[in-house]
Amino acid sequence: MAPSIDVIPTAASTAAGMISDMEAAFKSAVKLKQIPGAVVMARSMNGDIDYTRCFGARTVERDECQRLPPMEIDTPLRLASATKLLTTIMALQCMEQGLVDLDENVNRLLPDLSDMQVLTGFDAAGNAIMRDREGIIKLRHLLTHTSGLSYAFLHPLLQEYMAKGYLKTAEKFGIQSRLAPPAINDPGVEWIYGANLDWAGKLIERATGVDLEEFMQKNICEPLGITDMTFKLQQRPDMLARRSDQTRRNENGSLRYDDSVYFRHDGEECFGGQGVFCGPESYMKVLNSLMKHDGLLLKKDTIELMFQPALDAELEKKMNDHMDTTPHINYGAALPPVMRRNFGLGGIIAMGDLDGHNWRREGSLTFGGGPNIVWQIDPTVGLCTLVVFQLEPWNDPICKDLTRKFEKAMYSQVKCRN
């Protein structure tokens, strides 16, 4: 009998195997009706990696011919909180144009925000106890979620405030419902996830004299050649005809069509924190531009500022403590839940390498959106990735596992080529 020979896998064979396994996992998830569909994309700084794959369908509802229309690279998607990166870019463009400053008092453009009081609790009769804010709110606070604002659905005080009738449920899809809740702390005191980018959007509009849609078309879409990005979906019948539906996972794991208001009505105004619709390919153009520092959106120095940790040691600890005690929210998406994180201008910064050199590196910037959208830019490796589903709720275990498989497969490509 001939002696056995151990075959040592090469980096190339390992990378090919990881990509094959990843693609098989996505296809299996579609076949088993665990997800309706997804698009995954990756681009590298040097152009060696240019990967795009589309899986499954953009809806669980069959068309008149009993077909499930496919998910494609230009399928219009609801970005939800992935909009926040775009609004951050627009705010920084205003800074570059000399219209605003990161550290000036926003009172000049947002007196309604500056005058807002802080909710501290309720008295024995159930009346809200309010106090004046201490300190000034800066644009930097809005871009880093340190202004003292919180989303009403995330904070117990605001939930009680709403339950007592202080905040009425909006009858229309209007931005004022997002801007109405009072602050729950002073600026610069803690990291709280809230309607900061919606307020930043209002600041941009007042600084420029145009709405966010017009500013975005001129300053993001035109430079990058994007034609399918909008806050105003109902005014784009070409996009409406091809858009993805929203899908929701039931408690038993099955999928159902979600007739979301977002797809039937435009907001009364542009939501800087969650209002954009666009195709995956167009969003990747934004990520790629930032990664390459090509100057089409922002100057090199401004982009580098986005990747600098913006929170001091005390604020960073508070942010990490909050994130570690709310794993159900999982702001970091694919990030391991106990790793050290900071916040830059636009997203969460990983303050250490993930899985040695096999995954994201220290200094990578990431965020996402409620329908399990995850983007990340890794300047150390020179790689940006995008994973898009249109499936809720956020932090879905199946989507999260598939996202990690995809990212690690792309990083295996980087190791193979270096």
Curated annotation (Swiss-Prot):
Catalytic activity: ML-236A carboxylate + (S)-2-methylbutanoyl-[2-methylbutanoate polyketide synthase] = mevinic carboxylate + holo-[2-methylbutanoate polyketide synthase]
Listed name of the protein: ML-236A carboxylate methylbutanoyltransferase mlcH
Enzyme class: transferase
A Gene Ontology molecular function term of the record: acyltransferase activity
Keywords, comma-separated and alphabetical: Acyltransferase, Hydrolase, Transferase
This enzyme's EC code(s): 2.3.1.-
Phylogenetic placement of the source organism: Eukaryota, Fungi, Dikarya, Ascomycota, Pezizomycotina
Protein residues bound to monacolin J: R78, R178, Y193, Y262
Organism: Penicillium citrinum
InterPro entries, per the entry: Beta-lactam-related, Beta-lactam/transpept-like, Diverse_Enzym_Activities
Active site positions, chain numbering: S81 (acyl-ester intermediate)
Pathway in which the depicted protein is active: Polyketide biosynthesis
Function (record text): Compactin diketide synthase; part of the gene cluster that mediates the biosynthesis of compactin, also known as mevastatin or ML-236B, and which acts as a potent competitive inhibitor of HMG-CoA reductase. Compactin biosynthesis is performed in two stages. The first stage is catalyzed by the nonaketide synthase mlcA, which belongs to type I polyketide synthases and catalyzes the iterative nine-step formation of the polyketide.
Record-stated family: Belongs to the class-A beta-lactamase family.
Induction: Expression is induced at the beginning of the stationary phase, which is consistent with the timing of compactin production. Expression is controlled by the ML-236B/compactin cluster transcription regulator mlcR.
Biotechnology comment: Compactin (also known as mevastatin or ML-236B) and the intermediary metabolites Ml-236C and ML-236A are inhibitors of HMG-CoA reductase involved in cholesterogenesis. Their hypocholesterolemic activity might be useful for lowering cholesterol levels in the blood and reduce artherosclerosis and coronary heart disease.
Binding site for 2-methylbutanoate: G370
